[in-house]
Amino acid sequence: MSKLNKDILFLIFEELQDDSKSLFSCLMVNRTWCEIVIPILWRNPWCYDIKYYNKSYLFAIIVSYLSDDIKESLTKQGSQLPLVSYQVLLFDYLSFCRSINVKTIRSITSIGSYMTYNQFLLQQEFYSLFMKKFPELKYLNMKSIKHQIFYFPEAKFRFESLYELVCDTSIDPSYFYGLAWICQHIHRLIVVNVNPQVYHAIAKLIKVQKNLKYFEWEDDYGLPTTGSDPYKEILLALEKKVDTINHLKLFFIYKDRTSQKVLPKFHKLKTLITDFGPFSEEQLKFFIYRDLEIFEIDYYELKAASIIIENSGGKLKKIFFVSSYELDDYINNFDDDSRIFIRRVYESCPLVEYLSLVFPPSKEHFNEFEKLLKICQNLKSLFLIIYMNEVEPEKKLLLENGEELLKILIRSAPTNLREIRFLYDVEFSLEALEEFLEKWRGRPILSILTCRPIYKEENYVKLINKYKNNGIIKDFRCESFMNVVNINFNI
């Protein structure tokens, strides 16, 4: 590695840009590695898993860029700044930076003072400094912002290159109008709706974008609603961008008529994550996405999912169920809809790699599941929800479900399979699990995730460790329901 030239090292470290632990370790290898890693780390220094209010050195680095006059003024106001150091910084850190995270900046400035007014002054000086020192601004998370940073003299030149904006609706509309004036090349726009209002300013920002590719909207508030068609302006603005948007994520609390007209027009979508609850079966037939690759939908919408999948273009690689709550006993037509869903997947999505399935443990469903495994040979990850529609299924039934499931996986699992997640009404006896792991020998190393606490018992832990040591399984973890649904494995 030490003999690799700088260009190759840069490409390697670029792949680690989201892995702060590895990048920080690389800093310590030698000067060459350090010189390559620092610009990567400082491109977006606020995105790493750091308790910023404890990191006084980061505060000190930024303060060191302030002029003596500004430092003196801030000190007179009551801010506690680091002692002046005449040692020259090894790097011009801010010249590498291309991002601002308002929440993190607020956390950092709390080091200088506990008083809100003094923190505001510090933040103002930091933002002014960033506008002068940053070569460009690519990423801005301005949730709960209090500073009109786009009115600094240099702001226009920095904001012209803004690529990603994360915001929320607690922000005064004037901020969105200000951004719309200078930011017209945003590719990714993420909005958290925490304050129902008239969304004219956000709609204006959407309308002026020339190449918006990714849009995300998430409602994060309770009742009451703001009207009968609260998202109309947002959806009509998005309608003007159907030729550029290919990633769409919408979580609306309220249903409206406009979405029925607008959503079918996004004919270039590659990612679709939304709720189809308000649409009838006839309406859903007009939702045709031939380029769709990633599709996420709620557990309860099996029929809608089947229709979307059937009308897709066969390019789907990820089909995933999302939910913030657990399944209950009120899933209508569960047996029929789950069987049809499995069939639609293996008929229409032969290239699928990441797949969620929910079905009852009947012989017919197990047969359909096995057909799917034999056809979908690209599968890397399976999320299996075996659900019996019973309050407390007998343990005997849970073990029978588990034994049948493991037999099917041994017989028919594709060779690419690296990860399996199990939820609900399935449990593995010690004997069945050992037989499965023994027969898995010689296949790709496997990660398993489940939420049943039985696997924390001593005899199971001993068995799992045995097959970990033998290289049969990479991981076998028992987690909470939400972790099983949401946690990311590196497969």
Where do the language-model regions lie?
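Amphipathic alpha-helical interface elements that mediate macromolecular binding in regulatory proteins
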Residues: 6, 10, 31, 35, ...
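Alpha-helical structural elements of signaling/regulatory helical domains
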Residues: 18-21, 254, 300, 314
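N-terminal adaptor-interaction module of cullin-RING ubiquitin ligase components
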Residues: 1-166, 170-190, 194-216, 220-221, ...
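Recurring C-terminal helix/loop segment of individual leucine-rich repeat
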Residues: 1, 25, 89, 125-132, ...
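C-terminal capping region of solenoid repeat domains
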Residues: 273, 291-296, 306-358, 366-371, ...
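Exposed alpha-helical structural elements
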Residues: 54-61, 69, 201, 233, ...
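Concave beta-strand-loop units of leucine-rich repeat
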Residues: 101-106, 116, 141-147, 166-172, ...
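Leucine-rich repeat
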Residues: 92-99, 131-139, 156-164, 181-188, ...
